[in-house]
Amino acid sequence: MRFDLEPPSHASAAHRVAVLLVNLGTPDEPTPRAVRRYLAQFLSDPRVVEIPQLVWQVILRTLILPLRGRASAKKYAAVWLPEGSPLRVYTERQVESLKPLFAANGYRVIVDYAMRYGTPSIADVLAQLKRAGAERVLLLPMYPQYSASTTATAFDAAFAALGRMRNQPEVRTVRHYADHPAYIHALAEQVRQYWAAHGRPAFDSGDKLVLSFHGVPKRTLDLGDPYHDQCQQTAALLMSALGLTTFECRVTFQSRFGKAEWLQPYTAPTLKELGAAGVRRADVFCPGFTADCLETIEEIGMEVRDEFLHGGGKEFHRIPCLNASHAWIAALGEIAAENLQGWPVRVATAPEAVT
């Protein structure tokens, strides 16, 4: 096996620690070519599509990429921000917000981000962190609920990069934080602040809050993936924090791909049914997405909105994701601090948690 080229080893006074946020990824630009390149990498991951690769690659290259590339590019163009892809923009803001938070609490750590698909890649950022003197890296996926198709494949990519290194850094991973009190608090605060600015649904009159999580094939649940259970756990804790019951709140799953059965109930049909049943207002919040992206802005904010209004609903609200909200940045800092314990982060003072 050939290892990546590295400079000669020498005693380093840095001994630095890094916190690496890892998210899914995004095309570099909203063009058919860039989107096809991104989708080819994403949909070629056997963790994402569990079909024999010889068969799947023929379907992917001859049918899916030619058809979806242009259509998906139009959707990305509809949500693209002046600074770039929403997912990248909000992830960068999370990083830039975490840096002063750590510094203010005496933590001397490098904070950066990487994408599982597209750029910046996990391998490239790990190499960059090594060059910056990082000898210990905390991998912090931006997936609160564990799934093999998100968390595990991010770890796969990180460990594959480590496998090519002669001089490996020490690595820790955060598996999930679906029930972490700080995460639940951040979710509840996001909803409360939105309602404070836009009005609270009239739950006594039948208005609904829908908690929409990204779907996965139902088969993965049957094969032992804990994702569904953790989504339900998050939803139950959030409902409790908001003082809501299953009468006021529904849990659904979105972004179904292909014809196989996925986790149900599906988000879009549920909103259409609510509109047809006379529900006047529906608010949709996506607790499993830590940053707004195509699936939240376009799929929920445009497609699902139309389903609800065309079904008979009168008022639709998409509550923004956590993004770089104060409560979420504080939660990220707390989650990271708990997992940095025992590492030489050179704390000037010794706070119990990053706040």
UniProtKB/Swiss-Prot annotation:
Predominant location: cytoplasm
One Pfam family linked to the record: Ferrochelatase
GO cellular component, one term: cytoplasm
Enzyme class: lyase
Protein's UniProt keywords contain Cytoplasm: yes
CDD domains cross-referenced by the UniProt entry: Ferrochelatase_C (cd00419), Ferrochelatase_N (cd03411)
Keyword vocabulary terms for this entry: Cytoplasm, Heme biosynthesis, Iron, Lyase, Metal-binding, Porphyrin biosynthesis
E.C. designation(s): 4.98.1.1
Chain residues that bind Fe cation: 214, 295
Pathway listed: Porphyrin-containing compound metabolism; protoheme biosynthesis; protoheme from protoporphyrin-IX: step 1/1
Domain of life where this protein originates: Bacteria
Catalytic activity, as annotated: heme b + 2 H(+) = protoporphyrin IX + Fe(2+)
Subcellular location: Cytoplasm
GO molecular function: ferrochelatase activity; metal ion binding
Annotated PROSITE patterns: FERROCHELATASE
Gene3D superfamilies: 3.40.50.1400
Described function: Catalyzes the ferrous insertion into protoporphyrin IX.
HAMAP family membership: Ferrochelatase
Family per record: Belongs to the ferrochelatase family.
The protein, known as: Ferrochelatase
